[in-house]
Amino acid sequence: ELNPSLVISLSXGL
């Protein structure tokens, strides 16, 4: 499972 914080950091990166 991926942590919400990681998803936010990646999304943000994009």
From Swiss-Prot:
<keyword id="KW-0812">Transmembrane</keyword>
<dbReference type="GO" id="GO:0009535">
    <property type="term" value="C:chloroplast thylakoid membrane"/>
</dbReference>
<dbReference type="GO" id="GO:0009522">
    <property type="term" value="C:photosystem I"/>
</dbReference>
<keyword id="KW-0602">Photosynthesis</keyword>
<comment type="function">
    <text>Not yet known.</text>
</comment>
<keyword id="KW-0934">Plastid</keyword>
<dbReference type="GO" id="GO:0015979">
    <property type="term" value="P:photosynthesis"/>
</dbReference>
<keyword id="KW-0793">Thylakoid</keyword>
<keyword id="KW-0472">Membrane</keyword>
<keyword id="KW-0603">Photosystem I</keyword>
<protein>
    <recommendedName>
        <fullName>Photosystem I reaction center subunit V</fullName>
    </recommendedName>
</protein>
<keyword id="KW-0150">Chloroplast</keyword>
<comment type="similarity">
    <text>Belongs to the PsaG/PsaK family.</text>
</comment>
